[in-house]
């Protein structure tokens, strides 16, 4: 009764500038040197849940043969074509055709967005061209965006057009305009929400698929390369002393990071929809989950460091990178790891941001608010905890500044607010660096029974004589990293 019924989301409509699409997509085996984010995206766009259209300013190239005309005109499979201007009509006709050879769809683009783009000299787009040429390029870019939004009603328009990347205000509100790398994260997120976890898709009929748990587990292992040595030492120590607790402790870090990646996905899903109060609550709940899981992962590294440094087992509950007395004790035995957290160091600031945001689960919850500015769509934002606002702002200022973290400070009662998806992403990047730095300096070799060799320092080679694919192969790990936007 409650089992999933897929697809549960509408078909994803994507328009892409034709020169960005690899046809056929590169195989990770046959075209390894060409397997990159752009090539991976080209494969995912062939998925049955995606409706894909190619676009070019001058229409399809001569090599693309039209289908026999169902009525008065030829049509091109998988292309959207903009007809020439008609002096008898105010707009431009758009024709697009998917697969069925007996019909095509027409729509129109109307309005002066292309003229506005042509006259817009507020950016440095196409400054290398003379004025007339630059204006025509901006016009073509603005027209392409109109075709994506008004003509095809695309959810995503994939492009590297210079003007669209630099223009700060555009007419389009319905279509997300993005680069291939950005589109890869969006398309992959959409497919993951449909239960599709794909490492590569070389053509329409084949794909390398994973289950959800394996996808996020491989992601955690890829993002934490220092964990291969660190976790191997935990497991060897457990085997030597016949006590599984260190193995479970090390495994808990990887499990929490994998689950935090899932919760991060949920934050992005909540943020990439027309906003309402329900989505605000979802974003808050999933942000809390990310904070709790990441803090739990960080706490694990402190406990392993406590054990590796030979500190008393009875005092392990005091282990924590924010605890100065414990850091002094650790510094006497493992100074290289303790020195990472001197006051106002980068990692100390990361702990401050993570800890103070996580601590909201013990008191006043993070508060969401809905904001509308300049007739723009509503945005759901989150306020920094008022009691810790000053400390958080100081740490964030040293970690790249408020703008990078999406934090904007207003007079009370609004206070300092942030976009949850942006803050979660930036914090995740910092915590991943922290975990790797700590694990690399933790003297796990000093644990009883640990004898590390070269095979313990990286991913295993698990492919057997009859297998064709190892989920820990480099191309698979890179694919998942790219799809998650790291």
Regions found by a protein language model. Name each.
Residues 2-11, 18-36, 46, 61-119, ...:
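Acidic, Ser/Thr/Gly/Pro-rich intrinsically disordered interaction regions
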Residues 245-248, 252-265:
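Mature extracytoplasmic or otherwise solvent-exposed domains
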């Amino acid at each position: 009764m409650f089992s999933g019924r897929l697809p549960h989301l509408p078909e994803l409509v994507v328009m892409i500038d034709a020169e960005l699409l690899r046809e056929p997509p590169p195989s990770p085996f046959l075209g390894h040197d060409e397997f990159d984010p752009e090539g991976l995206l080209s494969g995912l766009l062939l998925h049955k849940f995606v409706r894909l259209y190619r676009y070019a300013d001058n229409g399809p190239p001569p090599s693309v043969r039209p289908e026999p005309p169902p009525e008065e005109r030829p049509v091109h499979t998988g292309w959207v074509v903009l007809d020439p201007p008609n002096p008898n009509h105010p707009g431009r006709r758009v024709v697009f055709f998917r697969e069925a050879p007996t019909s095509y769809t027409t729509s129109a683009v109307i309005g002066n967005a292309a003229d506005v783009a042509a006259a817009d000299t507020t950016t440095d787009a196409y400054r290398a061209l003379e004025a007339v040429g630059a204006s025509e390029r901006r016009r073509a870019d603005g027209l392409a965006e109109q075709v994506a939004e008004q003509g095809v009603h695309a959810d995503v328009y994939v492009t590297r057009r210079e003007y669209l990347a630099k223009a700060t205000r555009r007419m389009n509100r319905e279509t997300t305009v993005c680069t291939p790398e950005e589109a890869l994260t969006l398309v992959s997120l959409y497919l993951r929400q449909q239960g599709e976890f794909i490492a590569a898709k070389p053509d329409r009929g084949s794909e390398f698929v994973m289950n959800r748990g394996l996808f996020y587990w491989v992601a955690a292992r890829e993002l934490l390369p220092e964990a291969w040595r660190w976790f191997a030492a935990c497991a060897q120590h457990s085997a030597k002393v016949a006590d599984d607790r260190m193995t479970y402790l090390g495994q808990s870090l990887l499990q929490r990071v994998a689950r935090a990646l899932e919760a991060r996905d949920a934050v992005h899903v909540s943020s990439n929809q027309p906003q309402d109060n329900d989505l605000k609550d979802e974003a808050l709940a999933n942000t809390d989950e990310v904070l709790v899981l990441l803090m739990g992962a960080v706490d694990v590294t402190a406990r392993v460091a406590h054990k590796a440094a030979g500190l008393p087992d009875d005092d392990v509950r005091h282990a924590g990178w924010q605890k100065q007395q414990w850091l002094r004790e650790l510094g006497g035995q493992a100074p290289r790891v303790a020195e990472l957290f001197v006051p106002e160091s980068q990692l100390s600031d990361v702990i401050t941001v993570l800890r103070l945001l996580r601590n909201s689960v013990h008191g006043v919850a993070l508060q969401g608010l809905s904001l509308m500015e300049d007739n723009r769509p509503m945005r759901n934002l989150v306020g920094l905890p008022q009691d810790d606002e000053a400390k958080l702002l100081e740490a964030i200022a040293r970690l790249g500044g408020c703008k990078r973290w999406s934090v904007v400070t207003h007079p009370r009662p609004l206070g300092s607010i942030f976009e949850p998806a942006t803050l979660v992403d930036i914090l995740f990047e910092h915590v991943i660096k922290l975990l790797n730095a700590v694990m690399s300096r933790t003297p796990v070799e000093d644990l009883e029974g640990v004898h590390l060799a070269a095979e313990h320092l990286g991913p295993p080679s698990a492919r057997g004589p009859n297998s064709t694919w190892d989920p820990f192969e480099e191309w698979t790990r890179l694919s998942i990293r790219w799809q998650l936007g790291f």
